């Protein structure tokens, strides 16, 4: 299984200070359930836009921990027709492309904290494949109670 991680998830994980205390549990469950943690080329580009060179260097050093997608899925007419009313800022274009990767089946799930992306996922019929950090943890725990470590 392949879990595509939105830029905000990578930032939560690799930040110098904790910004979401559930991020460790998310990565624990991704590992326990043998998900490949993949990132999109657009995520790499976004992380390299940071003006703080020290933060940018930190992210560059940690990106090798993820599998980077080598190509970008073409957006089909069916896909774009479902989203044609969405405003097209640079962030919207990136979000739409990440959703397209799931829509096209190149990733099994997408994990994001972006509410707008989850709304778009509903329009695309892939809401069951787009999770927040806590929603994925809840699903993992409820579907795999035998794997919970109660220590």
Residue ranges and their predicted role:
Residues 14-17, 85-91:
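Short, flexible loop segments at the rims of nucleotide/cofactor-binding pockets, characterized by
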Residues 93, 111-112:
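Short beta-strand scaffold positions
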Residues 1-39, 50-57:
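Short, well-structured N-terminal submotif of metal-dependent ribonuclease cores
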């Amino acid at each position: 299984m392949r879990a595509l991680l939105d830029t905000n998830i990578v930032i939560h994980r690799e930040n110098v200070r904790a910004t979401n205390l559930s991020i460790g549990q998310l990565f624990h469950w991704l590992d326990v359930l043998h998900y490949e943690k993949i990132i999109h080329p657009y995520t790499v580009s976004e992380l390299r836009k940071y003006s703080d060179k020290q933060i940018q260097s930190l992210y560059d050093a940690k990106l090798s921990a993820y599998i980077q997608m080598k190509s970008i899925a073409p957006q089909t007419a069916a896909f774009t027709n479902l989203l044609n009313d969405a405003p097209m800022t640079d962030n919207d274009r990136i979000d739409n492309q990440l959703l397209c990767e799931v829509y096209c089946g190149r990733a099994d799930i997408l994990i994001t904290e972006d509410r707008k992306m989850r709304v778009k996922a509903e329009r695309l019929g892939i809401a069951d494949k787009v999770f927040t950090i806590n929603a994925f943890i809840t699903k993992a725990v409820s579907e795999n109670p035998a794997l919970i470590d109660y220590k």
